[in-house]
Swiss-Prot record:
Its main location: membrane. Pathway: One-carbon metabolism; methylamine degradation. It is found in: Cell membrane. It holds the Pfam family MauE. It comes from the Bacteria. GO terms for biological process: methylamine metabolic process. This is Methylamine utilization protein MauE. May be specifically involved in the processing, transport, and/or maturation of the MADH beta-subunit. The gene is mauE. It is a multi-pass membrane protein.
């Protein structure tokens, strides 16, 4: 394993980043439960009743994963759960890309902007899966973080999340602009 993956500051940065990612996803889904149910149903990988259950339960599971990632005794199982969820999300995205259903919304964040499914989103989820697995495998070998390392990791993880959300918003704006041009026949 790469030595940097067992550095306390790196692990804290990854844990905070993924925790913030999962809490942001959970909160946006909880605020827009019916809309998220429509997104899950529109993926057409589950029966209608299962889509309803997933739309109700998934945000709670995502919030629990977020909490687990920052509570050290729970961080390894939470990271494994995060990796499993991200892999399932990647599979659902890939199924729809393979079906040619790239016009549907990924449902990642309910920020008012639609983000169409694509191979890029599949890749993004696979990279996030790798980060979660890096936490799960690196944490047991890591030494405890000092206060400075923990604080630096916290700031680095929060900064990474802000950059990630900004890129996500820009991607949504770009997709909206492309859809608008297509609708106008340009």
């Amino acid at each position: 394993m790469a030595d940097f993956l067992i550095q306390p500051m790196v692990l804290w940065a990854l844990r905070i980043f993924l925790a913030l990612l999962f809490v942001a996803a959970a909160l946006s889904k909880l605020r827009h439960v019916e809309e998220f149910y429509g997104v899950v149903r529109n993926f057409r990988v589950l029966p209608d009743l299962a889509s309803r259950v997933v739309a109700l339960v998934l945000p709670v599971v995502e919030a629990a994963v977020a909490v687990g990632l920052v509570v050290t005794p729970l961080a390894v199982p939470a990271a494994v759960a995060a990796a499993a969820l991200l892999l399932v999300f990647a599979a659902a995205l890939a199924i729809n890309v393979l079906r040619g259903r790239t016009q549907i919304d990924c449902g990642c964040f309910r920020n008012g902007l639609k983000q169409p499914v694509s191979w890029l989103l599949v890749l993004r989820n696979l990279v996030l899966t790798a980060l979660a697995l890096a936490i799960a495998t690196g944490l047991p070998a890591a030494v405890p973080a000092s206060l400075t390392e923990g604080a630096t990791g916290l700031l680095a993880g929060a900064t990474a999340m802000l950059i990630y959300l900004s890129a996500s918003l820009l991607g949504g704006l770009s997709a909206a602009q492309t859809a608008n041009k297509t609708a106008k026949g340009r």
